[in-house]
Amino acid sequence: MSLVTTINWEKVDGLVPAVIQDNTSGQVLMLGYMNKEALNKTLETKQVTFWSRTKERLWTKGETSGNVLELKSINLDCDQDTLLVKVNPVGPTCHLGTPTCFDNDAEGKQEQPALVFLHQLEQVLANRKGADPESSYTASLYARGTKRISQKVGEEGVEVALAATSGDKAELVCESADLIYHLIVLLQDQGLSLSDVTEKLQERHNK
Protein backbone atom coordinates (compact mmCIF):
# COMPACT_ATOMS: atom_id res chain seq x y z
CA MET A 1 0.00 0.00 0.00
CA SER A 2 1.41 3.40 -1.00
CA LEU A 3 1.73 6.43 1.26
CA VAL A 4 -0.98 8.28 -0.65
CA THR A 5 -3.52 5.49 -0.22
CA THR A 6 -2.61 4.91 3.44
CA ILE A 7 -3.62 8.42 4.52
CA ASN A 8 -7.11 8.78 5.96
CA TRP A 9 -8.16 11.51 3.51
CA GLU A 10 -11.79 11.46 4.59
CA LYS A 11 -10.81 12.19 8.19
CA VAL A 12 -8.81 15.28 7.17
CA ASP A 13 -11.35 16.54 4.60
CA GLY A 14 -8.89 16.01 1.78
CA LEU A 15 -6.10 18.14 3.27
CA VAL A 16 -3.41 16.54 5.42
CA PRO A 17 -1.19 18.75 7.66
CA ALA A 18 2.48 18.51 6.72
CA VAL A 19 5.07 19.42 9.36
CA ILE A 20 8.26 20.45 7.57
CA GLN A 21 11.51 19.63 9.38
CA ASP A 22 15.14 20.34 8.48
CA ASN A 23 16.71 16.95 7.79
CA THR A 24 20.10 18.04 9.12
CA SER A 25 19.34 20.13 12.19
CA GLY A 26 15.95 18.70 13.15
CA GLN A 27 14.50 22.22 13.33
CA VAL A 28 10.80 22.56 12.49
CA LEU A 29 10.59 24.97 9.56
CA MET A 30 6.92 25.43 8.76
CA LEU A 31 3.47 23.87 8.55
CA GLY A 32 1.62 23.39 5.28
CA TYR A 33 -1.23 21.32 3.88
CA MET A 34 -1.25 18.75 1.09
CA ASN A 35 -4.02 17.15 -0.90
CA LYS A 36 -3.45 13.99 -2.92
CA GLU A 37 -2.24 15.92 -5.95
CA ALA A 38 0.23 17.98 -3.91
CA LEU A 39 1.61 14.88 -2.20
CA ASN A 40 1.99 13.04 -5.49
CA LYS A 41 3.82 16.00 -7.03
CA THR A 42 6.09 16.24 -3.98
CA LEU A 43 7.00 12.56 -4.31
CA GLU A 44 7.54 12.83 -8.06
CA THR A 45 9.59 16.05 -8.18
CA LYS A 46 11.38 15.68 -4.82
CA GLN A 47 10.46 19.31 -4.08
CA VAL A 48 7.79 20.06 -1.50
CA THR A 49 4.46 21.17 -2.95
CA PHE A 50 1.43 22.24 -0.93
CA TRP A 51 -2.20 22.99 -1.61
CA SER A 52 -2.63 26.74 -1.05
CA ARG A 53 -5.91 27.33 0.74
CA THR A 54 -5.80 31.06 -0.08
CA LYS A 55 -4.84 30.73 -3.76
CA GLU A 56 -6.82 27.50 -4.16
CA ARG A 57 -4.13 25.87 -6.27
CA LEU A 58 -0.97 23.78 -5.98
CA TRP A 59 1.96 25.78 -4.66
CA THR A 60 5.54 24.56 -4.81
CA LYS A 61 7.53 26.17 -2.00
CA GLY A 62 10.08 28.52 -3.56
CA GLU A 63 8.47 28.63 -7.00
CA THR A 64 9.08 32.39 -7.16
CA SER A 65 11.81 32.98 -4.55
CA GLY A 66 13.94 29.95 -5.38
CA ASN A 67 13.91 28.93 -1.70
CA VAL A 68 12.74 25.41 -2.42
CA LEU A 69 12.47 22.51 0.03
CA GLU A 70 14.30 19.46 -1.31
CA LEU A 71 12.56 16.30 -0.13
CA LYS A 72 14.52 13.75 1.91
CA SER A 73 11.77 11.62 3.46
CA ILE A 74 8.10 11.56 4.47
CA ASN A 75 6.65 9.78 7.50
CA LEU A 76 2.98 9.30 8.36
CA ASP A 77 1.90 9.48 12.00
CA CYS A 78 0.15 6.69 13.88
CA ASP A 79 -3.32 8.15 13.25
CA GLN A 80 -2.63 8.35 9.52
CA ASP A 81 -3.66 11.99 9.34
CA THR A 82 -0.44 14.03 9.68
CA LEU A 83 2.81 14.01 7.70
CA LEU A 84 6.36 14.68 8.89
CA VAL A 85 8.31 15.87 5.87
CA LYS A 86 12.10 16.03 6.21
CA VAL A 87 13.83 18.38 3.81
CA ASN A 88 17.02 20.12 2.86
CA PRO A 89 16.00 23.79 2.60
CA VAL A 90 17.56 25.92 -0.12
CA GLY A 91 17.66 29.37 1.45
CA PRO A 92 15.39 30.71 4.20
CA THR A 93 12.04 28.97 4.59
CA CYS A 94 10.00 31.85 6.00
CA HIS A 95 8.79 34.67 3.73
CA LEU A 96 10.28 37.07 6.31
CA GLY A 97 13.74 35.80 5.39
CA THR A 98 14.32 33.69 8.51
CA PRO A 99 15.29 30.00 8.45
CA THR A 100 12.02 28.95 10.10
CA CYS A 101 8.49 30.28 10.47
CA PHE A 102 8.72 29.49 14.20
CA ASP A 103 11.52 31.87 15.20
CA ASN A 104 9.61 33.59 18.01
CA ASP A 105 8.31 32.03 21.21
CA ALA A 106 5.10 33.14 22.93
CA GLU A 107 6.91 36.13 24.46
CA GLY A 108 8.49 37.23 21.19
CA LYS A 109 11.93 35.92 22.07
CA GLN A 110 14.09 34.12 19.55
CA GLU A 111 15.37 30.78 20.80
CA GLN A 112 17.65 28.36 18.99
CA PRO A 113 18.28 24.75 20.01
CA ALA A 114 22.00 24.00 20.31
CA LEU A 115 22.04 21.61 17.35
CA VAL A 116 20.32 24.18 15.15
CA PHE A 117 22.99 26.75 16.03
CA LEU A 118 25.76 24.26 15.19
CA HIS A 119 24.18 23.66 11.80
CA GLN A 120 23.95 27.39 11.14
CA LEU A 121 27.55 27.88 12.28
CA GLU A 122 28.61 25.13 9.90
CA GLN A 123 26.92 26.98 7.04
CA VAL A 124 28.75 30.19 7.95
CA LEU A 125 32.10 28.38 8.06
CA ALA A 126 31.38 26.62 4.76
CA ASN A 127 30.74 29.99 3.12
CA ARG A 128 34.22 31.17 4.14
CA LYS A 129 35.89 28.63 1.84
CA GLY A 130 37.59 30.43 -1.03
CA ALA A 131 37.17 33.84 0.60
CA ASP A 132 40.01 36.36 0.92
CA PRO A 133 42.40 34.92 3.56
CA GLU A 134 42.65 38.37 5.11
CA SER A 135 38.88 38.66 5.52
CA SER A 136 38.61 36.27 8.47
CA TYR A 137 40.49 33.76 10.60
CA THR A 138 38.42 30.95 9.09
CA ALA A 139 39.26 31.96 5.53
CA SER A 140 42.95 32.11 6.45
CA LEU A 141 42.74 28.57 7.85
CA TYR A 142 41.28 27.23 4.62
CA ALA A 143 43.99 29.04 2.66
CA ARG A 144 46.75 27.42 4.74
CA GLY A 145 45.42 23.98 3.89
CA THR A 146 44.58 20.65 5.44
CA LYS A 147 47.88 20.20 7.26
CA ARG A 148 47.50 23.43 9.25
CA ILE A 149 43.82 22.81 10.00
CA SER A 150 44.61 19.29 11.20
CA GLN A 151 47.39 20.66 13.38
CA LYS A 152 44.94 23.08 15.01
CA VAL A 153 42.48 20.26 15.71
CA GLY A 154 45.27 18.31 17.40
CA GLU A 155 46.36 21.31 19.46
CA GLU A 156 42.83 22.05 20.61
CA GLY A 157 42.28 18.39 21.49
CA VAL A 158 45.30 18.47 23.78
CA GLU A 159 44.10 21.71 25.38
CA VAL A 160 40.69 20.13 26.05
CA ALA A 161 42.37 17.20 27.79
CA LEU A 162 44.60 19.50 29.86
CA ALA A 163 41.63 21.63 30.94
CA ALA A 164 39.75 18.50 32.03
CA THR A 165 42.65 17.09 34.03
CA SER A 166 43.21 20.44 35.76
CA GLY A 167 39.57 20.52 36.87
CA ASP A 168 38.93 23.93 35.29
CA LYS A 169 35.37 23.57 33.97
CA ALA A 170 35.17 27.08 32.53
CA GLU A 171 38.39 26.51 30.60
CA LEU A 172 37.13 23.09 29.49
CA VAL A 173 34.05 24.69 27.96
CA CYS A 174 36.15 27.31 26.15
CA GLU A 175 38.64 24.80 24.81
CA SER A 176 35.84 22.45 23.76
CA ALA A 177 34.27 25.30 21.77
CA ASP A 178 37.62 25.87 20.04
CA LEU A 179 37.94 22.17 19.27
CA ILE A 180 34.44 21.89 17.80
CA TYR A 181 34.99 25.01 15.70
CA HIS A 182 38.26 23.71 14.23
CA LEU A 183 36.77 20.24 13.71
CA ILE A 184 33.92 21.72 11.66
CA VAL A 185 36.46 23.62 9.56
CA LEU A 186 38.43 20.41 9.00
CA LEU A 187 35.30 18.49 7.98
CA GLN A 188 34.35 21.23 5.52
CA ASP A 189 37.90 21.26 4.16
CA GLN A 190 37.52 17.54 3.43
CA GLY A 191 34.10 17.91 1.84
CA LEU A 192 32.32 16.45 4.87
CA SER A 193 29.81 17.79 7.39
CA LEU A 194 28.46 17.27 10.88
CA SER A 195 25.66 15.26 9.28
CA ASP A 196 28.20 12.66 8.17
CA VAL A 197 29.41 12.36 11.75
CA THR A 198 25.92 12.12 13.26
CA GLU A 199 24.92 9.50 10.69
CA LYS A 200 27.90 7.38 11.74
CA LEU A 201 26.97 7.79 15.42
CA GLN A 202 23.39 6.75 14.65
CA GLU A 203 24.65 3.76 12.68
CA ARG A 204 26.76 2.63 15.64
CA HIS A 205 23.92 3.24 18.09
CA ASN A 206 21.52 1.12 16.05
CA LYS A 207 23.83 -1.90 15.89
UniProtKB/Swiss-Prot annotation:
Name of the gene: hisI
Entry GO MF terms: ATP binding; phosphoribosyl-AMP cyclohydrolase activity; phosphoribosyl-ATP diphosphatase activity
Signal peptide (from-to): none
Organism: Photobacterium profundum (strain SS9)
Keyword Hydrolase: yes
Enzyme category, top tier: hydrolase
Lineage: Bacteria, Pseudomonadati, Pseudomonadota, Gammaproteobacteria, Vibrionales
Keyword Nucleotidyltransferase: no
Assigned GO CC terms: cytoplasm
Chief place of localization: cytoplasm
Pathway assignment: Amino-acid biosynthesis; L-histidine biosynthesis; L-histidine from 5-phospho-alpha-D-ribose 1-diphosphate: step 2/9; Amino-acid biosynthesis; L-histidine biosynthesis; L-histidine from 5-phospho-alpha-D-ribose 1-diphosphate: step 3/9
Subcellular location: Cytoplasm
Name this polypeptide is given: Histidine biosynthesis bifunctional protein HisIE
Region (Phosphoribosyl-ATP pyrophosphohydrolase): 118-207
SUPFAM superfamilies recorded: all-alpha NTP pyrophosphatases, HisI-like
The protein's Enzyme Commission number: 3.5.4.19, 3.6.1.31
